[in-house]
Amino acid sequence: MQTIRAATLYTGTEVLENATLAWEGDRLTSVGQGAGEGPLYPVVTPALIDAHSHIGLIRSGEPGAEAEANEHMDAMLAHADVLDSIQMDDAGFRESTEAGVLYACVLPGSGNIIGGDSAVIRNYAGNTNDALICRAGIKAAFGYNPMSVREWQGSRPYTRMGALAILRGKLHDVRNKLAQEAAVAEKGEGEAPRYSAEETVLRALLRREQRLRVHVHKADDVAALLRFVDEFGLDVVIEHTCDVHDGQTYRELAARGIPVVYGPLDTLAYKVELKHENWRNLAYLVSSGVTYGLMTDHPVILQKTLLLTLRWFLRVGLSKQAALEIITRQNAAILGVDDVLGTLAEGKWASFVCWSGDPFALESYPVAVYAEGALIHQEA
């Protein structure tokens, strides 16, 4: 068994003073206050988690022509797998790990109406098979982005209504096949319809076996998505919402139980659908009661700066503990990995970050980083 001590320990649910953390193998065996053995660190937190990124797809030190966030061959690629394009030799992974961001959800970009499957990964793994933890939904995009890439191949929309017409048509076709399949099963005769690879994914969405992770910034695009939710019964997570500047949108999402992965903060409002982007919009988010997490959208902002963006949540009134929970416990819950990550508790992975001081102080940095029980980074 190994142990460390923390003058201050953020568990992801509470703050403990003079605490001890113990683990055996990759699992925590005890977390609590009291005397213990092992090195003493000023502050210890759970491993940080980025809930939405393109790390390993748009890679540090490589030309843009080699980026793989968006496949250009068609606007509907539900059966694409983001894991097939992630390259673990991206220098961004090392920088993230050194900053305490050990886990990330990687998604296809937002140029396509549906871009493919996501992957929750270990940033410190040597290859993508070892990196993969689980899937966290199929990437889709509403709003400006799918209509902004008209020069790409395939059927490309020129308007929002064109993009959603393509998606609606595909979902209708698969829903009709599901009805045919049910009729054949009920009668016990006839031939059940066959599903293509793309239709198999859409079928899983209609059956709520898969979540749809939807890029959307503006309130009216959120409204359009909610119409789809009502029409097709989809299970969705809303990504971004940086242009939403009213409380009603978030209150409706809260009432419907639809979570938001907010961000990225600290980036240029580089398009019209971000004209109302402002960190002060966070007040609407945090006061609404909606379940939310936080992203970097790496490389839109670098993943290693994830914790720095929490300062805006402090500005709107959150405590340091509550802010840290966004990129630990809350992100883990949205991604479906809260059984092993997000909080420091007995039975969970021994993945944590030991800091030189208060993580919110500019001079502080990780001095030791543990991933599933192993020391993977240490500063001299």
Language-model segments: residues:
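N-terminal metal-binding scaffold of metallo-dependent hydrolase/deaminase domains
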Residues: 1-35, 42-44
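C-terminal cap of metal-dependent C-N hydrolases
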Residues: 4-11, 333, 345-380
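Divalent metal-coordination and catalytic microenvironments
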Residues: 7, 21, 26, 41, ...
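Active-site gating loops and adjacent loop-to-helix segments of metal-dependent hydrolytic enzymes
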Residues: 59-86, 127, 141-149, 191-195, ...
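His/Asp/Glu-enriched, well-ordered alpha-helical/loop segment
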Residues: 60-61, 67-73, 77, 254, ...
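Active-site core of metal-dependent hydrolases
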Residues: 82, 178-278, 333-335, 356, ...
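Polyanionic/metal-chelating signatures
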Residues: 99-223, 227-235
